Amino acid sequence: MLSTVNNNIVIALDAMGGDFAPLSVIHGAGFFLDNLVDPGIKVFFHIYGDKEEVSPLLLKYKKVSNNSEFTHCSDNVLANDKPSFALRHRKDSSMKAAIVAVKEGKAFGVVSSGNTGALMAISRFVLGTLPNIYRPAIASICPTKTKSFALLDLGANVDCNADSLFQFALMGSIFAKIALKIDNPEVALLNIGTEEVKGNDSVRGAFELLKNAPGINFKGYIEASEFLEGNIDVIVADGFVGNVMLKTAEATASTFINLIKQEVFNSWIAKMLVGILLKSKLNKALTRFNPKIRSGAMFLGLNGIIIKSHGNSDAISFAHAIKFAVNAISENLNQKIINGVSHIE
């Protein structure tokens, strides 16, 4: 059941998380309300933060103020806080208050640009995991040259056994159906080769669990050199490998895009030729890899929707993270995960 106020989807916002908070959060909420709300969906915000910083922004962004309720918090989680410290000592933080709002039924999901480790630790402590889920995983949508795919885990679990990887694959498949709008997503395990004998015990064990599992379109192994080809819809790895893979891909894409811009736009002749011949195609390609529209990572397997936006998110990035949360809620993602793993003993 959706958490609503007057039939609105309710999202809790951590106004103090991120490099550019609280402006990025409040402005982002306004951008979302102005540009990204789907027809027929109404969204209401519970906003948590420091009143001295947030209140002036709410006066400026009237539409956000009119569609929200603000609660003052005397503390906030810092970027360099260890998860254990944040859990024990940041008890009146905006991050924890937003998560507690989900626990108490005031909101259905949280969006935060704050400390990832602290967000996971507090969320897991306050909300717990869904039935039959051993560990939550961080999932995100990544671009390729032809389409997008879901990648998990992105850092929640550095070491994973076969059972955890198996569950990540099940959750990732359900996540992809909603996020990518694919009826039967193809799922693969990231490995150092495609032969069944390759990989460590956890990966090979997960392969055995998945190859005959019902309700999942498992395609075996995929190597890192293949993931940008766009042939697989869900790629599963442990949190260490997945995080390294994602950050390497992001850095490579950023470097490549900057090189193109430098080479093309340093010459007025090149600018003119690009404008005439390639502008629309180049813009389309650059948009596909634009991190601002892919700002949300989802914590799958928790008893509530938790979206982690990039720490350096600006207003547009944060707005897209809010949209990510609203889509997950409106599609009833967690109930579908519960149904999808109900056969696990």
From Swiss-Prot:
Subcellular location: Cytoplasm
GO cellular component: cytoplasm
Keyword set, alphabetical order: Cytoplasm, Lipid biosynthesis, Lipid metabolism, Phospholipid biosynthesis, Phospholipid metabolism, Transferase
Pathway as given in its UniProt record: Lipid metabolism; phospholipid metabolism
Gene3D superfamilies, sorted: Isopropylmalate Dehydrogenase
Keyword Lipid metabolism set for record: yes
EC assignment: 2.3.1.274
Pfam family, one: FA_synthesis
SUPFAM superfamilies, A to Z: Isocitrate/Isopropylmalate dehydrogenase-like
GO molecular function: phosphate:acyl-[acyl carrier protein] acyltransferase activity
Broad enzyme group: transferase
Family: Belongs to the PlsX family.
Self-association and partners: Homodimer. Probably interacts with PlsY.
NCBIfam families: plsX
PANTHER family: FATTY ACID/PHOSPHOLIPID SYNTHESIS PROTEIN PLSX (PTHR30100), PHOSPHATE ACYLTRANSFERASE (PTHR30100:SF1)
Name of the protein in its database record: Phosphate acyltransferase
Gene: plsX
